[in-house]
């Protein structure tokens, strides 16, 4: 029944599944009106309408492109439909079959038609009745006409006969022509046939809803009373005898014994009947349209007709010209602007004929398939060339239109499956990679078309990700930052989409480190989603990456990072930041305090700055809530009297903490009494008792002091011994400083020197006593200065230079720098220039320690204030200005003060240089002579007179002073320091002339035989600033490089030895009573060793080599070199060690010998006569976080000795054992030791670890039932983890070509792991319902072991990824087979459904899974093991050839029944990529990969899911589509795995895309088109 048009049925034009067909040329009924009427009809169209669509009209008279004849057409009926359906109700059909362009029919308020839409014969004009106004009513268009013209519209004309009505021109020509002006056309000869409207709604089974053309014999065409009143209904005839259920009949049959068999036979017969009826037996009669040979003119005319949409394709199919193929075909389509759908039709016709030509040649099927594939590749290459040509023509005329057409055409060819997907998409990605920045936007626009196809498989997706990231890296260069900003935004958008929606394509094993920052810049890290995604991607990439750098493999442990922070404090002086960073680095506060105390006392560091750094850090941690008292006592208990630690520094730290009341002495005494170590039978050397003796007593309460003395007395240490020592020291010091302590000490007995073995209780008491004495040593109420009596401040210190030198000597020998800082603070109130200069030099010498204490800035400001006071009262001394400038240069915040001080210095020097010559210089020969007894007084008068000095006078005085220095004049009693100070005062008069004379004198001294005085002359010259150590070393180096000058220098070896001695600092036990000049020399010495340590090492090496070649190395030279080298090693461990390694590799035997002695002293090695291997064991055994660089050096020395003595693999064995032991103890020092070994030695250690790893059994099975009894073998897992750690850390030793022998072992291990899994799953299925608790526990043990071994083997695969590459020497088939087996094992294990889901719940952050039940378990942060396994498989597939990937896919599809339920997993198709179906291509499949679980073939086929019966997986998979046939879209349902059932392969019905051709035959036949039976869910069955 066809309901009324107003019944509200769905209109065909609304159906979204059907495209609109271009309608034929039609004429509006308005064309029959006059011009004025036509204008009235068009006027309302200017108003905006909701939808501008034409009503549906049945065309019974015209055909697209045909001429309307005046005679009736043939009697074959035809039904055409307009191009656009109406959005309103169904409109009536006009007699001439044309739509009406009236506003009334296109608006939703139009009056519904009184007649239903009905097709009628051509000669019928009854439809024109609908044009006549009914019931005298006025239509809306008439009302509009009346409103505009003011009079009623003219009545419509009479109907025009259809065969007398001329239709307009073809669609697209908007002009309306009269009937007479239409050109005459030929009569249509093609028989008319009814066509289903393309916009009709399609029902199931390809039926069209409510479409029954008028034939006269349809039930709907019968007009009777019932149909006239009620309409026509399609009623289903239901049999009255049918019952509601089949139970009674079936139940009766089941009562009989043979009833069940009979029913089975009936159902089997019904199935066979249905199968026989469903088979298509008739072969296809489709033939491609033939091609004919045409002339050029006819070919051009044919192409123009093809470009004309009004010319039907069926007519053009008769004369398809030869010679249009390849790129020429595409160029013709572009030049003629042939519509895309018609251009694709031409390409299909040409392609179908080309492919059909291969079959007509009588070749075999396999050859035909090969030729067809070759032709398709060539055709794809032509398409690529066509598109490349257009892209290269960018900027030409009409380029945009041509490019738009070309992109649309090539996209249509691609999606019609007329191109080779792999070749075309590969070319697209290659073009994007090679595109210049100017053409990248064009390729990005095309990228949106092929985005889904590219991202469907990892092979393409990863390549696209790298290409986009590389382009983004190029355009983000600074020179393109602004001009290419839109391109940067577009690339960032694509990359962001990749990361968010296609995360697996951004897993880049080889380039993640290069593009990581770019990926981060494309994301919004403020968004939690983007942040989580980036962290996930970064972690996944880190899991599958292998560092090839030694530095990365040996990353610092937390302990080493903390030690680096400790070292940095001594140079940065930022205690607060370091304290916070240390607390964040190590959570174990006990370990943190232990490392700090060990760093303070280790012999592998130097300087008292460590002590005060430790004190400040401990005080910071104390304020942060850390119980440092407990941790310090715990450290002392564990340490004992360790000879390797300088315990005096530990006691110094504790004494400083006691001074600042940070360390609780009372709590320590309680701990001692509770411990009971202070009994009378304890030894004096007990560390607890020794600390008790070290505690300062100055600020302790009386009861605590009494308790300490009591405990000491019980331990056998009388308190009077400490008091007597303090009294002796005070007497000794008071004897040297009578002006300060003259009345405080009863006796003045002078002690030669204070004992070095003094406790900090004594040192602290002496320091407090000295500070009190200095604070009371002040000047009188008045003083005379510069001849003027001025009132003096009572707080002005009366210290003299000698007194300051003595006090500084005592405190520096004690190491009590905090007390020295207080003394210097009190000294700043002195008005003596020398004392203030010495105080500034003292601060400069202990700069790092004073900075850590926090006193440097305050002391510098106080010294500057004293300098300003002296400047107001008189002329300050040059020494003070020099000292303040040198100290201020080390304080960045005091740059303004230094600038002012430099101005003062320049003013003083310029004043001396510009002053007029003194009268004393008129006769220099008699004025000043070193033989004159009054030489010194005259010189003082000359230098302090403020007058000038000419160059001759300066030369005379300079000669006199140098004679005194060289000892030529012994009558003048001037020391070297005083003489050099005079030289320094002489220099400001003429600095350049003085420097020239000094250089000539030094060069002459080097060449003279009296050079023995050089070691005594240089230190004071350096101390006063006339000579610098760096300048002198550079001068000697230049002189020795010149052969002419070097030949005049006597004994160059001794000269180099003197330079070396010049750099050796004084020994700790040596007296440090230094005056201003000597102290400055040691300050310059310290500065040179810190800044120019490399030059110092060169001096040592040069002196050793020169003296060894001359007369051998004496003990003095060896001692100096050893002392200096040890100091440098402790100051700059890492840099000096690297220098020494270079010297060792350069075969400096003498330097290596001295270096070995130095290392023996540092490492306290005494087994010098033992074999090298024993020494190596001792060195490795004593390695810790501090001695690591020195042990590296020592082992390198031993390794060189081993190579000379050919000791074999001795040290390699020792190092391997050390690596195992250190790894078992959770240490990492062995990494640093191995890093310096030769590559061959490192490779041997790694190979031994790999051998031991592969020797560990995978599972420890118990006796009895081998299938379910798995005992927990934690020891084996820990051992495997240990060796795996060693292999991972030494992965950088793997050569670039890989280790080919490891690949087959890993494949076998993975096969064995899969075999164990299959056996376990089979046993679980066969024992369902009878599993005991023991079996459950055994299964859990098995799963945990499986997770560990799977993770460990995956890590080994990542490490040895290059081992699976195809070498030239190995047969390719064998390598491909191993690669496929490895992929199969990884896929099967990773997707196996274990009962506890341990592979999904257990992250791969740790190799050892913990026994946690899956109930209520939340996955830990990290990448799940399953995801990690698939990432590893992806990294392998990136490097494997396509053959391995295809073999793996075929095996998983065809011969892996236990895992059929995962065959349709998207991850399989994404990783393995498109695999051609061997069955549909008529090519026999290649040899299948052997099953990794072949050993389990005798067991029943298991299923990975324990909840499914044995056959459920097969039944589930058999209902799933499979295979990727030729011509089927990749993303359709049919592009999945094929199934094998009862010897037959079931797959989708294949249809060649070249044969899906419409209008192929000139005459309509029964089966003239290729139908894709896939739409009917049909399958092709092959036996």
Swiss-Prot record:
Its main location: nucleus. InterPro entries: Mediator_Med12 (IPR019035). Residues 66-79 have a biased composition (Basic and acidic residues). It is found in: Nucleus. The keyword Nucleus applies. Residues 1-117, 1481-1525 are annotated as: Disordered. One of its GO terms (molecular function) is transcription coregulator activity. The keyword Electron transport does not apply. It comes from the Eukaryota. Component of the srb8-11 complex. The srb8-11 complex is a regulatory module of the Mediator complex which is itself involved in regulation of basal and activated RNA polymerase II-dependent transcription. The srb8-11 complex may be involved in the transcriptional repression of a subset of genes regulated by Mediator. It may inhibit the association of the Mediator complex with RNA polymerase II to form the holoenzyme complex. Component of the srb8-11 complex, which itself associates with the Mediator complex. This is Mediator of RNA polymerase II transcription subunit 12. It comes from Aspergillus terreus (strain NIH 2624 / FGSC A1156). The gene is srb8.
